C-alpha cells in the first residue's frame, strides 16, 4: 500500500503497523510519500521534481515506520519503486481544497490517478481517498469559514461526494467520519481538545487509533478477511500538552475507537451517535 499525503496522512496511518502485527498480518508492505503541509495540486504539479517527498516505509511484519532521509525523493520515483495493490491520496485538511471543489482540485486528483495508472498500465492499483477531518470545536476557523464543526463536516462530505463522482477514485477511507463518531462518545472529555492536538491534528493516541482502524477496515480487511474488531494493539503514551495531546489506548477505550471506525465505514457520510459508549 502506498499512502501519498502530509501530516494528516501520518495521523491516519501511524498506528497501522502495530495493528497489522497484532492481527497476525505479516505480508503487507506499506510506504508513505510524505511532504508536510503539501496539497494535492502541489503533489501533481511537482510529480517528477526531485527532493519533494520523504520516503517512509514499513516492511512486512515490522511494528513501526522508518525513513531514509528527509525530502530526498520525487513522488514519481516512489510511485514507480514498487507494484502497488492500493494507492491512497489525501488532501491537506488545513486547505480549502479539502472542502471546496474546483477545477484545480479535480485536475490534480485526476492527474495523479493518471500518473499512478501510467506507472502500472497492466495492473492498475485500487486508488483510495482518505477523507479530511473537521477541526476541533474550539478552532479559530469557526465562525470565520464555517458556522460550526457540523457545517465543516458537511462541507467535507460534499467534497468527497464530488471527488467520487468526478474522478477515478475507487474507494473512500472515512477517517474524518470516524473522528466525528468518536467525538460523540464518552471519550471526548470536556478539556477543550475535542480529541485533537491544538484543535487541528488528531490526538496522538485514541483518535489516531480510530483512524488507523478505519484504514484497516477499508483497505486491509477486504484483502485479508481479517477483522479489526478485537485488535490487541495498544498505545501507552499519555500527554496533556496542547500540541502533543495523547490519550492512551487501553483495553477499555480501544473497542470504542474501533466501533467509531466500523460505524464510519458503514455510513461514511453521516455521524453515528455513540453517546452510549
Predicted regions and their residues:
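Catalytic nucleophile serine of serine hydrolases
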Residues: 7
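Conserved catalytic region of serine esterases and O-acyltransferases that act on ester linkages
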Residues: 194-195, 199-277
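Alpha-helical cap/lid subdomain in secreted, periplasmic
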Residues: 72-205, 217
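Short hydrophobic segments within beta-strands
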Residues: 2-4, 33, 130
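Intrinsically disordered, low-complexity coil segments
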Residues: 49-68, 101-103, 118-124, 165-166, ...
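Short, surface-exposed connector motifs at secondary-structure boundaries
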Residues: 1-2, 124
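Conserved SGNH/GDSL esterase-like catalytic core that processes O-acyl groups on lipids
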Residues: 10-106
